[in-house]
């Protein structure tokens, strides 16, 4: 550091960290110990998947059904499968099954039990389903699910599988707990191997893991209290926090430790730490801000799962940045020169490793690319477009039990139900109809008959069922049957009517995700219903509401991310074109990542190898989630590399030289950071939750492509093709400071000295004019 330069605030921050290093470590240790027990309990208190739009028409309809008919989301479907292929649809068999399940009726939380009456598929008579209505709300049912499951009696000669919303949510919570452990078992050792290869010592390699684990545990512990206060937090949150916290926490620590090790070569521990905070610490702050853009944008979509990802992502990134600028520097200050302790290899091999690092590998690649920029650009873009192509045929849907693999009882039971019954009836559109009088009053019968007759004539309707079906279309027949107490009791038992409320099931001609089914839901909601007040809900309506919520704000999300990213890069690079190029390249890596996800999860290519049970669709929320996360991380790598190129360009005025030196300075570190992020995030590919598998695969592919093919090949090629135009901006807007000092520590410019190996780049061969 120059003697005449003024220390920056971050330099002084590093000095203070060094002087208070023991107190800072003890404070973090105390915080970790306090929050760890709550972090471990977080998955067990999350009761919702976060898909349900608050106050949506479908949610209002469900509430009306629960109030008026006692139809609650807290229910179970018990799928009974005969071991001897006995016909369980026969009356005697169904009577026997209900008798064997009769002990359930004595339980205080069981409201009713009855056989499902939906249309059946041929050849599956050995499978039947029993609906168990619970006298509990959804949260209480989930908390008592294991007790409920334990009280289900066995059926002689048959196997029983419990599914339904409550069972699926319970299994999802179990999957979250096991997935976190599995991902850590896979990801942390893999990250440690990469860190050992980068640093060469066990001491240095362990520090980023400590920072990552502390960031995750602290974040999850803090979010435990938020989840207690807000019951809508998604049960995907712990997986997301673990994935992102380990990835960015270890990546940020990699930058800090790398710079500190290099500075220790020629400085004492205090000065080395101060310079590390002023350079690498600044880069980590800027990187954290870049990643926060995408997470902030998620909050614009009014769905609990997006809000949960947004809160979790923002919190864990902020904590990771804080840990990287407080805990980690304090640990480094305590270690000092002992950071080089416990080497992995003998000294002679370590020296050879240094020679390889200084061999100019990345510089040579850059110069080769810039010698053939057109050919390489065309080849790389063609390859990426080929990976992006499957996105054109992407079919999005909202999963339910499909988020779990078939080894889970709730998923397997759901698959059996789909086999045995008409899927369209199981996922029918449900209309809660408020009648003008009691359901057996002629006015109510007349009004509901007019409504159902009109619905039957609508395009896309296969069948309409209601309590009027007992009269086969005749008002007189309906009145005749309703005069019998046993018929009324049976209708009320099956939750078809009660007082002034009736339920109408509209079975669509097509699947629940078909465009005509979606239009049918919209038509039902806008049609005139004289004498009735109708609320349209059911699975197709519920999923349509989710899609509408996303589409309502997607333009705002994209616009916010692009606009804020452009402004930040415009300020950082003082260039009009470079931010546009960065966004274009981010979209290429993002599109390629989504393309691979479509190949695997929709088309089934490689699905068996990855343990994916593909359904021919993609989780509808996935493209937005991947976009928001990848865009921030890719911008992080872009800033890391282009800032170093800019520093060399402003010093030399030579675009080609600056590009080669920039890649040489940052290529190894960007690749290492990307590999660490990829193995941590990629570990979730081998977990049970299909949504997290897809997110893990998409992020891994996108980040690896961004840090390798795009940063190593496409960036140098475009830098060469655009030449000095890369650096153009109006003088009145952002004047460029040419011939700036290389002492980046003492400037206010955005720098990525933290992303370098600590070596100053060599001067170019030609002479440069002295700075005025």
List the model feature ranges, each with a label:
Residues 54-75, 82-166, 393-607, 617, ...:
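Structured non-transmembrane domains adjacent to transmembrane bundles in polytopic membrane proteins
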Residues 30, 78-79, 381-382, 429-432:
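Short coil/turn segments at secondary-structure boundaries
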Residues 46-49, 401:
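Short hinge/gating elements
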């Amino acid at each position: 550091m120059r003697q005449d330069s003024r220390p920056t605030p971050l330099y002084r921050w590093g000095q203070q960290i060094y002087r208070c290093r023991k107190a800072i470590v003890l404070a973090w240790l105390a915080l970790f110990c306090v929050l760890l027990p709550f972090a471990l309990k977080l998955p067990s208190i999350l009761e919702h998947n976060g898909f349900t739009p608050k106050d949506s028409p479908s949610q209002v309809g469900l509430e009306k059904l629960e109030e008026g008919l006692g139809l609650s989301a807290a229910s179970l479907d018990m799928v009974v499968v005969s071991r001897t292929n006995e016909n369980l649809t026969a009356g005697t068999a169904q009577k026997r099954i209900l008798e064997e399940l009769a002990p359930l009726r004595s339980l205080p939380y069981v409201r009713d039990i009855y056989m499902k009456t939906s249309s059946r598929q041929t050849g599956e008579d050995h499978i039947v389903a029993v609906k168990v209505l619970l006298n509990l709300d959804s949260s209480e049912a989930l908390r008592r699910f294991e007790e409920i499951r334990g009280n289900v009696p066995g059926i002689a000669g048959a196997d029983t599988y419990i599914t339904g919303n409550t069972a699926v949510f319970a299994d999802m919570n179990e999957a979250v707990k096991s997935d976190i452990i599995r991902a850590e078992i896979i990801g942390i050792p893999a990250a440690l191997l990469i860190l050992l290869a980068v640093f060469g010592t066990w001491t240095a390699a362990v520090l980023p893991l400590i920072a990552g684990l502390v960031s995750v545990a602290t974040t999850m512990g803090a979010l435990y209290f938020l989840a207690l206060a807000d019951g809508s937090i998604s049960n995907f949150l712990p997986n997301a926090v673990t994935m992102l916290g380990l990835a960015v926490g270890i990546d940020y620590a990699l930058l800090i430790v790398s710079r500190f090790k290099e500075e220790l070569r020629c400085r004492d521990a205090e000065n080395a730490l101060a310079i590390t905070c002023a350079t690498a610490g600044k880069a980590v702050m800027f990187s954290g801000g870049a990643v926060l853009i995408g997470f902030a944008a998620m909050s614009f979509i009014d769905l609990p799962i997006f809000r949960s990802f947004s809160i979790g992502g923002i919190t864990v990134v902020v904590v990771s940045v804080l840990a990287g600028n407080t805990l980690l520097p304090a640990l480094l200050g305590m270690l000092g020169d002992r950071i080089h302790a416990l080497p992995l290899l003998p000294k002679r091999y370590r020296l050879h490793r240094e020679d390889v690092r200084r061999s100019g590998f990345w510089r040579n690649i850059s110069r080769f690319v810039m010698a053939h920029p057109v050919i390489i650009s065309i080849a790389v873009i063609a390859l990426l477009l080929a990976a992006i192509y499957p996105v054109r045929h992407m079919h999005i849907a909202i999963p339910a039990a499909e988020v779990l693999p078939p080894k889970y009882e709730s998923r397997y039971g759901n698959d059996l139900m789909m086999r045995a019954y008409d899927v369209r009836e199981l996922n029918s559109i449900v209309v809660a109809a408020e009648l003008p009088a009691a359901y057996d009053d002629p006015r109510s019968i007349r009004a509901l008959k007019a409504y159902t007759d009109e619905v039957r004539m609508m395009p896309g309707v296969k069948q309409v069922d209601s309590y009027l079906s007992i009269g086969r279309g005749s008002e007189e027949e309906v009145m005749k049957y309703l005069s019998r107490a046993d018929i009324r009791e049976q209708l009320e038992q099956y939750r078809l009517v009660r007082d002034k409320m009736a339920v109408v099931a509209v079975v669509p001609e097509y699947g629940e995700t078909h465009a005509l089914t979606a239009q049918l839901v919209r038509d039902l909601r806008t049609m005139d219903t004289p004498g009735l007040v109708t609320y349209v809900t059911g699975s197709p309506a519920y999923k349509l509401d989710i899609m509408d919520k996303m589409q309502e704000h997607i333009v705002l999300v994209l616009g916010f991310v692009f606009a804020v990213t452009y402004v930040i890069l415009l300020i950082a690079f003082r260039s009009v074109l470079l931010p546009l190029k960065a966004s274009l390249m981010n979209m290429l890596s993002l599109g390629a990542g989504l393309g691979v996800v479509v190949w695997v999860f929709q088309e089934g290519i490689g699905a068996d190898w990855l343990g994916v049970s593909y359904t021919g669709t993609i989780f509808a929320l996935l493209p937005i989630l991947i976009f928001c996360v990848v865009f921030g991380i890719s911008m992080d790598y872009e800033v890391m590399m282009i800032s170093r190129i800019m520093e060399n360009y402003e010093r030399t005025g030579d675009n080609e030289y600056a590009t080669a030196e920039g890649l040489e300075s940052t290529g190894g570190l960007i690749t290492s950071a990307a590999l660490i992020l990829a193995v941590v995030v990629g570990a979730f590919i081998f977990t049970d939750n299909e949504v997290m598998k897809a997110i893990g695969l998409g992020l891994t592919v996108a980040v690896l492509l961004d840090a390798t093919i795009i940063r190593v090949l496409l960036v140098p090629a475009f830098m060469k093709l655009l030449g000095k135009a890369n650096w153009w901006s109006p003088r009145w807007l952002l004047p460029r400071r040419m011939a700036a000092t290389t002492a980046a520590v003492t400037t206010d410019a955005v720098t990525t000295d933290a992303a370098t190996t600590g070596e100053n780049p060599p001067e170019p061969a030609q002479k440069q004019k002295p700075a005025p």
